[in-house]
UniProtKB/Swiss-Prot annotation:
This is UMP-CMP kinase. Consists of three domains, a large central CORE domain and two small peripheral domains, NMPbind and LID, which undergo movements during catalysis. The LID domain closes over the site of phosphoryl transfer upon ATP binding. Assembling and dissambling the active center during each catalytic cycle provides an effective means to prevent ATP hydrolysis. ATP binds at residues 13-18, 134, 179. Binds 1 Mg(2+) ion per monomer. Belongs to the adenylate kinase family. UMP-CMP kinase subfamily. Pfam families: ADK. The modification N6-succinyllysine is found at residue 106. It catalyses: CMP + ATP = CDP + ADP; dCMP + ATP = dCDP + ADP; UMP + ATP = UDP + ADP; a 2'-deoxyribonucleoside 5'-diphosphate + ATP = a 2'-deoxyribonucleoside 5'-triphosphate + ADP.
Length: 196
């Protein structure tokens, strides 16, 4: 069976992680966060990519696509090897730019199907406030205002065009993510119930 993938996109603080956790619980998807995989890999002393990832994350830059895709593939392969029924994946925070998308199409063409793109649309100021709140407890080095301004710029320049591209293909399911967690999840449920 081929992996069925839903790409989850939205700016920093749009609530991607929070909503993904709920989707996993309700629909049995496996959640793969590109950012988390990279952060874990960065901490792994045996990783060949660790230092490289560290440098990119510190500078608020997007990590080279080969690294991200190899981590995503590894996770999907391991999940499906352990349980063949588990072939539904939420991939969160990817593809983040044109390069990511081309890399995915080149590497994963025919190997995985993208069902749709779940787009959490959220006003920048709300996103920044949420991240600053999260930064107090998350210990994430990039949850500070300066880093956030950079991450939002990167998102607007790089990721938004990808969403527009999928929009043209009729694959985007857009959600107003500025509402409360429960209200947002109600919208998510409508989409997943319809898409199956």
């Amino acid at each position: 069976m081929k992996p069925q993938v839903v790409f989850v996109l939205g700016g920093p603080g749009a609530g991607k992680g929070t909503q993904c956790a709920r989707i996993v619980e309700k629909y049995g998807y496996t959640h793969l966060s590109a950012g988390e995989l990279l952060r874990d890999e960065r901490k792994n002393p045996d990783s060949q990519y660790g230092e490289l990832i560290e440098k990119y994350i510190k500078d608020g830059k997007i990590v080279p696509v080969e690294i991200t895709i190899s981590l995503l593939r590894r996770e999907m392969d391991q999940t499906m090897a352990a349980n063949a029924q588990k072939n539904k994946f939420l991939i969160d925070g990817f593809p983040r730019n044109q390069d990511n998308l081309q890399g995915w199409n080149k590497t994963m063409d025919g190997k995985a199907d993208v069902s749709f793109v779940l787009f959490f649309d959220c006003n920048n100021e709300i996103c920044i406030e949420r991240c600053l709140e999260r930064g107090k407890s998350s210990g994430r080095s990039d949850d500070n205002r300066e880093s956030l301004e950079k991450r939002i710029q990167t998102y607007l320049q790089s990721t938004k065009p990808i969403i527009d591209l999928y929009e043209e293909m009729g694959k985007v399911r857009k959600i107003d993510a500025s509402k409360s967690v429960d209200e947002v999840f109600d919208e998510v449920v409508k989409i997943f119930d319809k898409e199956g």
